[in-house]
Amino acid sequence: MEELTPIILQRYIVDLSQKGNTKTGKGLAPNSVNCIILVLHSSLSMAYVLGLSKEIHVDKIKRPKTSEKPVESFTKEEQKMIEQAVLSDKRDKMFGIILCLYTGLRIGELLALEWSDIDFTKAELSVSKTCYDGQDENGKSCRITGTPKTESSKRVIPIPKQLIPHLREIKKRSASKYVVGNGSKIITVRSYQRSFELLLQKQKISHHGFHALRHTFATRAIECGMDVKSLSEILGHKNPTITLKRYVHSFMEHKREFMNRLGKLL
């Protein structure tokens, strides 16, 4: 503890920002780094109070700037084009794109989803796993499956009844335990992202990341009048405040539409 200095802490924070993600080797998000700084501040303050270390002013450490990325989602016309392209595609694995559009699943949750996670009678799916691309003990690329990073990410999502017949047919043909499978082969996150990118290129739709499917689901849900608490639970957010903050523009547009309808009574 005596060797710990503000300079060492600052270097540590820089390392976290540049290569702190042990899964990807890339930097941690600014919000994640700032959370770590808060824990450090609390721990070091307590150590000082207990006489275990000298006082270190963590509050003087330069923090990474946080900025809310604009929410990217597809228009209704683009969504329809994507759906038609998926339904005309002979590869069953592509149906996962539609499943994301109507459940808000993250790509890792989608690829980790097994047939045993779907209750066809109740028309709902259980999210209890996620996956990401990593390396095995020999340094070879592989897909790693684990538990979601938060308890709120573990959830049960109702499936629109219109999707059930499609899922039943795909299950009959499937030789994989995964809903999005390719026989005995495991589909990596990157390869599925690439399949989605190629679909967008073929349809001449402006490129958005795979996460835009989740944002599109949230946007459509708001447009249909879903309340923020229900949407938050379906998305697996820790609390409705996160949902409201992220989709504040969509909620405002929804309010404006209702107010304009009300104005027509004049």
Predicted regions mapped to residue ranges:
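N-terminal core-binding DNA-recognition domain of tyrosine site-specific recombinases/integrases
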Residues: 1-52, 68, 186-191, 206-209
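Active-site/catalytic core of tyrosine-dependent DNA strand-transfer enzymes
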Residues: 160-206
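Basic, Lys/Arg- and aromatic-enriched nucleic-acid-binding interface segment
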Residues: 26-30, 34, 49-55, 59-113, ...
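C-terminal catalytic core of tyrosine-transesterase DNA break-rejoin enzymes
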Residues: 31, 49, 98, 102-109, ...
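Conserved tyrosine-mediated DNA breakage-rejoining catalytic core shared by Y-recombinases
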Residues: 112-169
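Short, contiguous acidic/charged loop-to-helix segments that flank catalytic cores in large enzymes
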Residues: 71, 86-88, 144-154, 180-187, ...
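DNA/chromatin major-groove-contacting recognition/catalytic segments
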Residues: 81-85, 136-143, 224, 245, ...
